[in-house]
């Protein structure tokens, strides 16, 4: 008795069908990836805002314990950092991080002085140390081989900020610039020295078409988060920042920007 075997053709993609599938996947990826990137950027901006709120609160707590003065107005002998405020703008500030370091008790962890959108600075990694004090040493001490100094902080410091002037710039994203044409990369500053040790800069109040405060395109897409003298944190575009500076009560608005 003969057995009859039926032959079934196994289905497979033709080359054209395969190319169509690949094209569809590419189109879907092209649609989804920008949306995912936008969602990631938004999440990073929110995280940065929360970090700056902690920084602003720490400044306020420090001031409450030091006669309503922020660290920049308190001597190092009294636990502040006034000796590290430059006498004039457009000078290097290799110890700009110190204004934040002296608030280590208030900040609790150095992770809050890093913006997740900052591609030019180095965050403190939890694998470096699990102890509170040692993590801060990684910021302070270059002799340890991992000292980050200014590279451990994403945020500027407003040297003249006062508790009694709530509109003054206290801290904020380091992609700030006093050059209205600031583009990609680290801040472009007017009359900036060549050293890569950070810079102090006058943001001013009278903005012009060629010289004026603003934000570079990095970090938060031509915008930035700013902590004000009252401890609040707001998101600013270049236009809003300039308006804020005009109403700050400070004619210089000098800030220190880490390298």
Regions found by a protein language model. Give the residues of each.
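Short, well-structured segments within or immediately adjacent to enzyme catalytic domains
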Residues: 49-259
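Exposed loop/turn and edge beta-strand positions of beta-sandwich/beta-sheet ligand-binding modules
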Residues: 9, 18, 42
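Generic anion/oxyanion-binding catalytic loop in active/binding sites
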Residues: 25, 44, 220
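N-terminal leader/signal peptides at the extreme start of proteins
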Residues: 1-15
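Beta-strand-loop-alpha-helix segment that lines the small-molecule cofactor/substrate pocket
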Residues: 37-46
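Active-site helix adjacent to the Tyr-X3-Lys
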Residues: 30, 42, 50-53
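Alpha-helical hydrophobic helix detector
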Residues: 19-38
């Amino acid at each position: 008795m003969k057995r009859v075997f039926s032959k079934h053709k196994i289905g497979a993609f033709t080359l054209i069908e395969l190319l169509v599938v690949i094209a569809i996947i590419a189109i879907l990826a092209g649609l989804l990836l920008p949306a995912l990137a936008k969602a990631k950027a938004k999440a990073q901006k929110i995280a940065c805002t929360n970090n700056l709120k902690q920084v602003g609160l720490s400044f306020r707590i420090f001031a409450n314990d030091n006669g309503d003065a922020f660290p920049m107005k308190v001597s190092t002998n009294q636990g502040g950092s006034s000796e590290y405020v430059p006498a004039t703008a457009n000078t290097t500030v290799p110890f700009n991080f110190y204004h934040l370091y002296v608030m280590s008790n208030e900040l609790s962890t150095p992770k809050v002085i890093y913006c997740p959108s900052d591609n030019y600075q180095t965050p403190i990694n939890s694998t470096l140390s699990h102890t509170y004090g040692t993590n801060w040493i990684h910021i302070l001490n270059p002799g340890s081989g991992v000292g980050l100094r200014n590279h451990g902080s994403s945020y500027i410091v407003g040297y003249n900020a006062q508790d009694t002037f709530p509109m003054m710039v206290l801290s904020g994203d380091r992609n700030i610039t006093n050059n209205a044409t600031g583009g990609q990369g680290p801040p472009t500053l007017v009359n900036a020295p060549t050293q890569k040790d950070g810079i102090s800069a006058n943001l001013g109040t009278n903005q012009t078409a060629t010289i004026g405060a603003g934000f570079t395109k990095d970090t938060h897409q031509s915008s930035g988060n700013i902590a004000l003298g009252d401890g609040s944190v707001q998101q600013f575009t270049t236009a809003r920042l300039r308006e804020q500076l005009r109403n700050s009560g400070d004619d210089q608005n000098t800030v220190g920007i880490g390298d």
